[in-house]
Amino acid sequence: MVREIDCNELTELLELYLHLHENTVPDTTEILNNAWNTIVQDKNHHIIVNEVNGKIVSSCVCVIIPNLTRDVRPYAFIENVVTHKDYRGKGYATQCLNYAKEIAIKENCYKMMLLTGSKDDKTLSFYNHAGYNSADKTAFIQWLE
């Protein structure tokens, strides 16, 4: 079942992120709790999860960003697309991305964007099949310490 995350599911989400790029679940600190509270209280920040048999197996984040161009239409940014390694290839992440697209359409976004650090052909093909292309824009990243 695809849905938005409940505020009491932080631990499950952090455990899923171990299948993204994290090595450990962060300690519960005031900084973590403040960040989580900010996220769940932000009407433009959507953490989408796919639950199978009571377990969160896939997720993505969809942030709606207000904009002053394109007829003052917002755009959506997708981040942290992840599926538990034991559940990959079953369409769960695609369902999360489709849910994000529904949110973006409802919010009148004119585009959706995502970045991936992966160069793996399977990952790139996944995003292409989900409707994203890598031809229209060039992304630049500046990592901050």
Label for each model-derived stretch:
Residues N37-V49, F77:
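A short helix-loop-beta-strand connector motif used in the catalytic cores of GNAT acetyltransferases and
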Residues D71, H84-Q95, E107, K119-L124:
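Conserved glycine-rich acetyl-CoA-binding loop
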Residues M113-T123, I141-E145:
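Conserved beta-strand-loop-alpha-helix junction that forms the acyl-donor binding cleft
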Residues M1-L13:
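A short beta-loop-alpha structural element at the N-terminal edge
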Residues V49, K55-I64, V82:
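Conserved beta-strand in the GNAT
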Residues N80-T83, G89-E102, H129:
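Conserved acetyl-CoA-binding loop-helix of GNAT-fold acetyltransferases
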Residues L97, A104-T116:
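Conserved GNAT acetyl-CoA-binding A-motif
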Residues L14-W36:
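Conserved GNAT-fold acetyl-CoA-binding loop/helix
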